[in-house]
Structure formats: structure tokens, C-alpha cells
Amino acid sequence: MANPVYKILTEGAFIEARRKGHFLGSADDLRDGFIHLSLADQLDGTLAKHYAGQGGLLLLAFDPARLGAELRWEPSRGGALFPHLYAPLDLAAMLWVEPLELGKSGAHRLPKRIAA
């Protein structure tokens, strides 16, 4: 299996996605026309830029092979290639979900299973 791709969701958004079986996107995703995903080594930057100090977040891991041809790798922050999904995010492709805890500094702590 290829390295997982990750999506950060609020608990509420995850509950709704689980009810539907898929996630259609956040306001930013809908504005940009695709679902923003990250690789493990991109998560710290994504969390710092878009979710600084925000609690109640979950980290979802997905198998990129199960997301299909609508998963594209495109330049984004600093020219790095990021995974962008041009389709609903199917929860059937989810490998696992874990809470993102906030440390005392206000920075998020990634789950131990991630080797970023």
C-alpha cells in the first residue's frame, strides 16, 4: 500500500460524513473545487496554517489507491505536491481515525502511528 493521505475534520463534520458515508468538503474545499488532503510530512504545516489552537479535530487516514483517478498531486504551499481529491471523500477508503490533541503550547500532537 502507498503512504496514506490525511484529512483533518472537526468532530461534527466527521459525524455528518459518517452518516452519509462520504465527505463533500469544507468551505475551503468547496470554494477551491477539490478536497484538500495532506501527506504525513505536510500535516504539521497544515495544522499550523489552518487549525492553530483549534480543539475538537480528528485526523482521518485514507488509502490513496482506493480514492481512484480523481486523486491528483498538485503544487501548493511552497511548491510542494499535495494530494487533491476532485470527488467526494468516500469513507470506505478510510484506514483509521484518531483525535488530534492540543499540547500545552497550543500545537497539535500527531498520533504516534504517524512517522512524519
Mark where each language-model region is:
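Conserved, structured core segments of small domains
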Residues: M1-A116
